Swiss-Prot record:
GO terms for cellular component: cell surface; extracellular region; phosphopyruvate hydratase complex. The active site is at E205, K338. Catalyzes the reversible conversion of 2-phosphoglycerate (2-PG) into phosphoenolpyruvate (PEP). It is essential for the degradation of carbohydrates via glycolysis. Belongs to the enolase family. It catalyses: (2R)-2-phosphoglycerate = phosphoenolpyruvate + H2O. SMART domains: Enolase_C (SM01192), Enolase_N (SM01193). Its cofactor is Mg(2+). The keyword RNA-binding does not apply. It comes from Lactobacillus acidophilus (strain ATCC 700396 / NCK56 / N2 / NCFM). This is Enolase. Its main location: cytoplasm. (2R)-2-phosphoglycerate binds at Q163, K338, R367, S368, K389.
Length: 428
């Protein structure tokens, strides 16, 4: 039987969960098998992220993606026709070379990523394998999940500067059992916030966006909700924060303007220590310092790496070269993985491999502008013992990922997943 090759690559403009245009791609193979992917988009973006190609002009507020769509349907389609869909590295490198820029800005990272993801899906479908199996092989584990239930920063219009307050199931259990605990805490949190006199409108990622005074108030609400839901903070349910410090860092004075205070690196560390002392269930912090504040991040890592997980997002932008630099400098102990920060499946997997090889945990992440695409759920399982954050257990574009994980767990037939920060994961 003849080997299947790529017959056609087609894109169209669709809309994400924030009502902004994004790219959907269909890759059709010569045997009739099709792979589909939808590309997400972020609200808070790092300086070194691969570049989304937007149209500009007056249409759709300048956010249209017809140029990216056209690039898929012309240049990329012409370049990939007849290629082997199972050679993902070659497919991705062909598009990188075709683009010819260091940040995928000519063809658009949104165009390239859509094709990269859809090709992987098509190859998995052609193999009659689920995507997680195609990407990950045999040894698979359900991921540790992190759920953004109180939104601040760029994700909500309120007074909280820290961007995300997450809850995570930390007792060894099935994914389903852990997720049910999260759902219970989420609904309890709504009642707690209402009792505190706050509105319970939702932010971009399905979390509540109460107009609180400061981060301590948000953490107190989470602590109380965990207990009222019948669980033990730090034993059943943990807390994590995405500080997104670049958004309260002032480049002019080199200080952090956080909730009415102006803080130096050391003063910010002292502020974080106060939170950690008051809330020992706080187990993970993402981007606690500005993406260009290498000194602050390295110093914080040296003093806190054995106490909490320090996740690098804007600091590395899922870029192997930036991760290599961070490892050499001693920054962080975990990598946040966002497909659209780097723009191809191959480079994403390279960043994951480099992280694991150097003892860094890996957390797969959604973006604030999401679709119903569940690629990241399969990816989180494929990497075996990783972590996943994809919003609250609300809003369909978030819940789709969790429902996909429930399906995968049913298929795997496993009743137990890894505990928080497993020390028995093979990082090689």
């Amino acid at each position: 039987m003849l080997k299947s090759v790529i017959e056609n690559v087609h894109a169209l403009e669709i809309f994400d969960s924030r009502g902004n245009p994004t790219v959907e791609v269909h890759v059709t193979l010569s045997n009739g098998v099709v792979g589909k992917a939808e590309v997400p988009s972020g609200a808070s973006t790092g300086e070194n992220e691969a570049v989304e190609l937007r149209d500009g002009g007056s249409r759709l507020g300048g956010k249209g993606v017809s140029k990216a769509v056209n690039n898929v349907n012309t240049e990329i389609n012409d370049a990939l026709k007849g290629m082997d869909p199972f050679d993902q590295p070659k497919i991705d490198q062909t598009m990188i070379d075709l683009d010819g820029t260091p940040n995928k800005g000519r063809l658009g990272a949104n165009a390239i990523l859509g094709v990269s993801m859809a090709t992987a899906v098509a190859a998995a479908n052609a193999n009659r394998q689920p995507l997680y199996r195609y990407l990950g092989g045999i040894d698979l584990e359900m991921p540790q999940t992190f759920h953004n239930v109180i939104n601040g920063g760029e994700h909500a219009d309120n007074g909280i500067d820290i961007q995300e307050f997450m809850i995570t199931p930390i007792a060894k259990t099935s994914f389903r059992d852990g997720f049910e605990k999260i759902v219970n805490v989420y609904h309890t949190l709504k009642k707690v916030l209402e009792d505190m006199g706050y509105e319970t409108g939702l932010g971009d990622e399905g979390g509540f966006a109460p107009n609180m005074k400061n981060s301590e108030e948000a953490l107190k609400a989470l602590h109380e909700s965990i207990i009222k839901a019948g669980y033990k903070p730090g034993e059943d349910i943990g807390i994590a924060c995405d500080c997104a410090a670049s958004y309260f860092y002032n480049k002019e004075d080199g200080k952090y303007h956080l909730e009415g205070k102006v803080l130096t690196d050391d003063e910010l560390a002292a502020y974080y220590d106060k939170l950690l002392d008051e809330f020992p269930e706080l187990m993970s912090m993402e981007d606690p310092y500005d993406e260009n504040d290498v000194e602050g991040m390295v110093k914080f890592t040296a003093t806190h790496k054995d106490r909490i997980q320090i996740v690098l997002d804007d600091f590395i932008c899922t870029n192997p070269a930036l991760l290599k630099k961070a490892i050499k400098e001693g920054a962080g102990n975990a990598s946040l993985i966002k497909l659209n920060q780097i723009g191809t499946v191959t480079e994403t997997l390279e960043t994951i491999r480099m992280s694991r090889k150097n003892g860094y945990n890996t957390m797969i992440s959604h973006r604030s502008g999401e679709t119903g695409d569940t690629f990241i759920a399969d990816l989180a399982v494929a990497i075996n013992g990783g972590q996943l954050k994809t919003g609250a257990p609300a809003r369909s574009e978030r819940v789709e990922k969790y429902n996909r994980l429930l399906e995968i767990e049913e298929e795997l037939g496993k009743g137990e997943r890894l505990a928080f920060f497993p020390d028995d994961v093979d990082h090689d």
